[in-house]
Design a protein with these regions (language model features):
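PLP-dependent enzyme catalytic core of the Aspartate aminotransferase-like
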Residues: 23-27, 31, 35, 39-40, ...
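Generic structural signal for small/hydrophobic residues in well-ordered secondary structure
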Residues: 29, 46, 80, 142, ...
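N-terminal basic, amphipathic alpha-helical segments
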Residues: 1-5, 234, 240, 363, ...
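Active-site PLP attachment segment
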Residues: 182, 191-231, 239-243, 358, ...
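Structural signature of PLP-dependent enzymes
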Residues: 230-236, 254-278, 307
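Conserved glycine-rich beta-strand-loop-beta hairpin in the small C-terminal domain of fold type I
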Residues: 263-277, 289-304, 342
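Conserved core of the PLP fold type I
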Residues: 1, 7-170, 175-197, 201, ...
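Short, conserved charged micro-motifs
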Residues: 308-314, 356-360
Length: 378
C-alpha cells in the first residue's frame, strides 16, 4: 500500500516537509546507504530536490558562474566536464550564460561479448590535467555522469580515482550524476564500485526506477553543501515534494527498491541493449557503424564514421520517417563541434521502448543510413 493509513496520507500530502526534504526518506536513505556501503552518513549529509534537474540547477550555480574575489574583482568559474559527450540537460542550467569546460575523449576500439564493431570513450587525462582553467583557479567543480547519458559509458574505478584526486588537489568538489547507477536503478553492467567522502557530491533520482512524475532528486554531500541546497529549496520551492518520498521510504526500508533494481530494471535494460545491438548488426553490419560498448543506462550511442550528412540532418530525415533520435553534436557541451567531425557523426538512440517499436525504429535507421552511404559511393 502506498499509504499505511489515512493519517499517513495526510502527513505526506497535506503538509510541507522542511526545506531539506522529507525526514523519513532522508532517514531511510541514511540507513540504507550506510548498510550497503558503510559510509557513516548522517541526516546532515542528505538533501532532497524536485528532481535531479533541479539538483543540478542548484549545484552548477553554487559552484559555477561569477564569484566575487574582492570589491573590485570577480572571477568566472566553470564546471569541468572531464569527458564529453555528456548529459544534454546540463547545458542551460546556469542562470547567467554557459560556464563549462570540456575535454574531448580518447576513442578506443573494443570488443563486446566477443564481437568487434564497438568502441569506448576514455578520459584524456593528459589534456585534462593540463587545462589552463584548472591551473588558473577558474574551475568550480568537476562533474561526470556514471553511467553516462548519452553513451552508456561507465568510467572505470581507475578513472574515478584520478578524477577524485584531481578535484581534491584543486580544492573543488567532484559531482557524480548517478541517475542510472548503483544502487538504484542499477542500470550498470560493469564491475565497478561506488565511493563517497565529503569532497564528493553524489546525485540520485527516483525517475529511473519508474517514478519520473514524482520529481524526486537526492543529493549526498558535505553538511555545508546540504545546508546551501536546503536554503535554495526554501527560496525556490519552499520545500521539496513529498509524494516520491512517501512511495520510496517503505521500499528502501524493506529492501524492495534494491530488489526491483537488481531483479527487474537492470535485466530488462540489459536485454533491451542486447536486442538493439543484434538488430543494428543485422541492418547495418556491412556499413561503417560503430556502437559504444553498452555498459549501462537506457540508450545506445551510434557512430557512423564519415557519415555523408550531419547527425542533425540525419535527425530530420529520420523524423520524417517517424523515428526519433537525438543528434550527437548537442551532447558535446563546452566543445566547438564545428571543429570536431566525430560529434556530428553520432546519435543517441533510446532502448526503452517495447521490442516491436525498437525493431521498427532500427529498421528505419538502417534504411536511411544505408541510403546515405550508398548515395555517397555513386
Amino acid at each position: 500500500m502506498l499509504f499505511r493509513s489515512a493519517e499517513h496520507a495526510v502527513e505526506n500530502i497535506g503538509n510541507y516537509s522542511n526545506p531539506q526534504g522529507d525526514a523519513a526518506l532522508i532517514d531511510a536513505l541514511t540507513a540504507f546507504l550506510n548498510r550497503e556501503y558503510g559510509w557513516n552518513l548522517t541526516a546532515d549529509n542528505i538533501a532532497l530536490t524536485n528532481g535531479s534537474q533541479n539538483a543540478f540547477f542548484y549545484l552548477f550555480n553554487l559552484f559555477g558562474g561569477k564569484f566575487k574575489v574582492s570589491d573590485d574583482l570577480s572571477v568566472e568559474k566553470a564546471i569541468l566536464l572531464p569527458l564529453a559527450p555528456e548529459y544534454i540537460g546540463y547545458a542551460d542550467v546556469h542562470v547567467e550564460g554557459q560556464h563549462f569546460v570540456s575535454v574531448k575523449p580518447k576513442i578506443e576500439a573494443v570488443e563486446h561479448e566477443g564481437e568487434a564493431g564497438f568502441f569506448k570513450y576514455r578520459v584524456d587525462f593528459d589534456a585534462l590535467e593540463s587545462l589552463p582553467e584548472l591551473k588558473e583557479g577558474k574551475v568550480g567543480a568537476i562533474c561526470c555522469s556514471r553511467p553516462t547519458n548519452p553513451t552508456g559509458n561507465v568510467l572505470t574505478d581507475g578513472e574515478m580515482s584520478r578524477l577524485d584526486a584531481l578535484a581534491q588537489e584543486h580544492g573543488i568538489p567532484l559531482i557524480i550524476d548517478n541517475a542510472y547507477g548503483m544502487p538504484f536503478p542499477n542500470i550498470i553492467y560493469s564491475d565497478v564500485t561506488l565511493n563517497w567522502h565529503e569532497n564528493i557530491i553524489l546525485c540520485f533520482s527516483l525517475s529511473k526506477v519508474g517514478l519520473p512524475g514524482v520529481r524526486t532528486g537526492i543529493i549526498i554531500a558535505a553538511p555545508e553543501v546540504v545546508k546551501a541546497v536546503s536554503s535554495l529549496n526554501a527560496i525556490v520551492n519552499l520545500s521539496p515534494t513529498r509524494f516520491g518520498a512517501a512511495i520510496a521510504t517503505p521500499l528502501l526500508q524493506d529492501g524492495r527498491l534494491k530488489q526491483l533494481s537488481d531483479d527487474v530494471i537492470r535485466p530488462f535494460y540489459r536485454n533491451q541493449a542486447q536486442t538493439a545491438v543484434s538488430l543494428l548488426k543485422r541492418e547495418l553490419g556491412a556499413y561503417p557503424l560503430k556502437i559504444h560498448k553498452p555498459e549501462g543506462a537506457i540508450f545506445l550511442w551510434l557512430w557512423f564514421e564519415n557519415l555523408p550528412v550531419s547527425s542533425q540532418t540525419l535527425y530530420e530525415m529520420l523524423k520524417a520517417e517517424g523515428t526519433l533520435i537525438i543528434p550527437g553534436e548537442h551532447f558535446f557541451v563546452g566543445i566547438d563541434t564545428q571543429d570536431y567531425p566525430h560529434a556530428r557523426e553520432c546519435i543517441r538512440m533510446s532502448i526503452a521502448q517495447d521490442v516491436e517499436t525498437l525493431e521498427k525504429g532500427i529498421v528505419a535507421i538502417g534504411r536511411v543510413v544505408r541510403g546515405l552511404y550508398d548515395a555517397g559511393k555513386q
